[in-house]
A protein has these predicted regions:
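Flexible, polar/low-complexity N-terminal or interdomain linker segments that lie immediately upstream
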Residues: 1-34, 132-139, 143-147
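Positively charged, proline/Ser/Thr-rich regional signature most characteristic
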Residues: 13-86
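Catalytic cysteine-centered active loop of the rhodanese-like fold, especially the PTP/DSP P-loop
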Residues: 66-120
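Glycine-rich phosphate-binding P-loop
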Residues: 100-103, 142-162
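A conserved segment at the C-terminal end of the G1
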Residues: 107-112, 155-167
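Conserved nucleotide-sensing/catalytic segment adjacent to the nucleotide-binding pocket
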Residues: 162-231
């Protein structure tokens, strides 16, 4: 009996096919495919024991041990999980690390139960190679970088573009000391896969890309080197907005939106405690650059703002966010501009930069 195979393809991701990952949970946590659900053939301990048997006694002994470990009630439970997933997603595909014995075993068991589903040839490894190649290829196509002072709403601008790629969204981090997301950051592989999906979801997946001006490190994630080099040589647009506008935007980003996320994830009491801890810790991390006296002044203002926030006055945060912009972020940005002079295709307010980026994308369409 030759069990069906499908070739690895980005279309499987773009079309949001349900993928059943039969690797162990520890492998899944180290990097998964977008849209995949982890329904393992073996759990972490079983995989570990089979791996030892393979190393010490060879493949036949490892296979025999695997059959012994995953039998009876354990086998029935895992079969049930696969059957339920396929009932909910009849077009689901199966994969393991290389599309070999584990996914073939799952296929075989399902076939014996009257269910035929293909596995992906080459498995996770082949699909990851396609995603990474797609990300690298984007650096060879036209790319535009959106720059500007902190609070210029660059990320919302990116998300208003059909060819935009939100790197901060992929990293689940806003790229600054205050940018940590309440949910855990993705691992490096999942960050790269999120970039790949972002590119696939563009109106023209083979067209130009517009990104925000970022350092290569966004939180714990690193922008892939080839893509980063494409960003470095790409033309730039600079958003210029007045201080009061940027202050309102930064309050929305660092306070209003962050509170919504914490409240939704953890509830009022714990969410408030965790948000306060994040913001106060982030401020302390800037001690070296702010200096002790300035840090202590901002800490006092931040503490007062927290009290006012509890009374319903979120605008009070502008008392410490304002100096943070004018005394830290703005001078830092201007220093970087002086150190690395840049030529901008366009400099203007948010609306004009959005219009320019849309026009640029249309002119560079594939």
């Amino acid at each position: 009996m030759r069990l069906p195979l499908v070739d690895p393809s980005l279309d499987l991701l773009h079309n949001r096919r349900r993928l059943i990952d039969v690797r162990a949970p520890v492998e899944f946590a180290q990097g998964s495919l977008p849209g995949a659900v982890n329904l393992p053939l073996m759990d972490n301990e079983e995989r570990h024991r089979v791996g030892i048997a393979y190393a010490e006694q060879g493949q036949d002994a490892a296979i025999a041990l695997g059959k012994q470990l995953v039998d009876g009630g354990i086998k029935r439970a895992r079969m049930t999980a696969w059957q339920q997933e396929i009932a909910a997603h009849p077009d689901a595909l199966i994969y393991c690390f290389r599309g070999g014995l584990r996914s073939e075993t799952a296929q075989q068991w399902l076939w014996e139960a009257g269910i035929e589903r293909p596995r992906i040839r080459g498995g996770w490894k082949a699909m990851r190679k396609l995603i990474c190649n797609h990300v690298d290829a984007a650096s060879e196509r036209p790319m535009l970088v959106i720059s500007g002072l902190t609070g210029s709403a660059k990320t919302p601008l990116i998300n208003n573009l059909e060819q935009g790629l939100d790197l901060e969204g992929c990293a689940r981090h806003k790229g600054s000391a205050f940018g940590r997301h309440p949910l855990p950051a993705p691992c490096q592989i999942d960050f790269e896969h999120a970039m790949g999906m972002g590119l696939l979801n563009q109106q023209q997946p083979q067209g130009p890309t517009v990104v925000e001006d970022e350092s290569r490190h966004i939180g714990a994630a690193n922008v892939p080197l080839i893509f980063w080099r494409g960003m470095e040589k790409a033309p730039r647009v600079r958003v210029e907005m007045p201080l009061d506008w940027r202050l309102a935007q930064i309050r929305k980003d660092y306070i209003d939106d962050l509170w919504t996320l914490y409240q939704r994830q953890y509830g009022d009491w714990l969410g408030w405690a965790l948000m306060r801890k994040q913001l106060s810790t982030a401020l302390v991390r800037l001690r070296k650059r702010l200096g002790l006296a300035r840090l202590q002044r901002l800490q006092r203002l931040q503490t007062l703002a927290f009290r006012e926030h509890e009374r319903g006055n979120r605008h009070a945060h502008e008392a410490w966010l304002g100096p943070l912009l004018t005394e830290y972020y703005d001078p830092l940005y201007r220093y970087q501009l002086e150190k690395h002079p840049q030529t901008f295709l366009h400099v203007g307010d948010w609306d004009s930069c959005l219009a320019f980026a849309r026009d640029w994308s249309a002119r560079h369409a594939a």
